[in-house]
Amino acid sequence: MYKRQVVGSAIAREMSRYRLKIGVLEKNLDVCYETSGRNSGVVHGGFAYDTGSLKARLCVEGNQFMGQLAEELDFKFIRCGKVLVGNTAEDMETLKRTIRQGEENGAAGLELIGKERLHQLVPAVVGEFAMFSANSGIVDPFNYTIALAENAHANGAAYYFDHEVTGIRRDSEGIYILTTPKGEFHTRWVVNSAGLGCGNISDMLGICGYKVIGSKGDYIILDKRTGHLLPMPVYPVPSNTYMGIHVTNTTDGNVIIGPNAEMVTDFTYYGVPQENMDYLAKSASDLWPCIHKKDYIRNYSGILPKWVDEEGVIQDFKIEIRDDIAPRAINLVGIESPGLTAAVPIARYAISLMEEREKLTPNPGFNPVRKGIPRFAEMTKEEQEQMIRQNPDYGQVICRCEKVTRAEILAAIHNPLGVDTMAGVKYRTRSMMGRCQGGYCQMRIAQMIEDELEKRVTEVRYARKDSQMFFGRVREEA
């Protein structure tokens, strides 16, 4: 497998239900550094996609059992609902069409609401009416992706980080040989779930002709003190191809603003220009006038891989096996939004294509349950006292903003996937995600990584292999 991180990990987890030897080749140093960790974190209801499309069908399926999945894998999911806010007669007609389409797609919990009900749901919102989607929700995209990967790993899937696939060929017996800078991998089956790289991998398989462009969206993160003002995501009335700049609450209390949409060919640049931040804030303020620069704590961007036709029209998910060109290769192209919501149904659909061609034997030892790192800050006082008695490391707070303890940092450093970066700790614990953005805890965490993993300080990386943080010590010990 070569993978888009959340979908690829979902495929690895679903494949581990069977007696298969699974290897996941990942070009990055963790599973949530690109599209899967750079999005709004919204669990969509399934009303925004063309009836009959895979996007619609798989999104509705993913929404329906996200709660069960969150219980099994111990990640944060809140079914808080969502509103699409309108003001004009044209907006009203668009929302009515959206509800009809959603009902045809099987999406439940959709209704038009007036101004009074809208302000009961979201008191700070500006608008005359809205479509309320009761079944929409929010998820922690980092923890969700990591949970899928850790459960896949616990059930036998091997993860190979820093293994970018640079070539694919087949030998005389039809075995695929995948070339990486760290060696070759031989396999009967290949899954292309490479996200932004799906077009390149598809070409390597000989399945040519897919045009994949990037849609870059920028975001602003607001301080947690704004969270009580936004109980659910607030969207404008969408266009045919774009959901619009929205404001979204998060599972941990922050608010995020965005995204805009800019078509790009460079899939590596994640900078956020000041003018884009100003545009995001101005646009979102029309919906939710609670945005102040003093509350900005960080910005980020994400890029979605969109498969388009010759006229530039965005296409549906493509999930296929081309027996005539690349037998035993599952090819996924254009897996963009709602990929986060639909990840597990996408995985099951892909595996169903495999089952049509190969008898799969169930894995009797498969365990769907994964336990995450306990969050000290979310425990009751009595629970905290008990944890400290059991492990004194819970009594030492390393990240003051998010109240993350030494015990949690240690658990993240020694994570099952063997990720050893600063960002790996950040995404597993929320350390460095608070108001000071690591001003207090970052050096302490770097020191813990150095000590626990017996690394030199110059070997500590932030997220990517070229993200060296330190180049030596000011004072070397004698």
Can you say where each PLM-predicted feature lies in the sequence?
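Conserved small/polar residues in nucleotide/adenosyl-binding loops
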Residues: 1-5
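Dinucleotide-binding Rossmann-like beta1-alpha1 core, especially the glycine-rich loop
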Residues: 41-117, 121, 127, 244-245
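C-terminal catalytic lobe of FAD-dependent flavoproteins
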Residues: 113, 141, 242, 251-252, ...
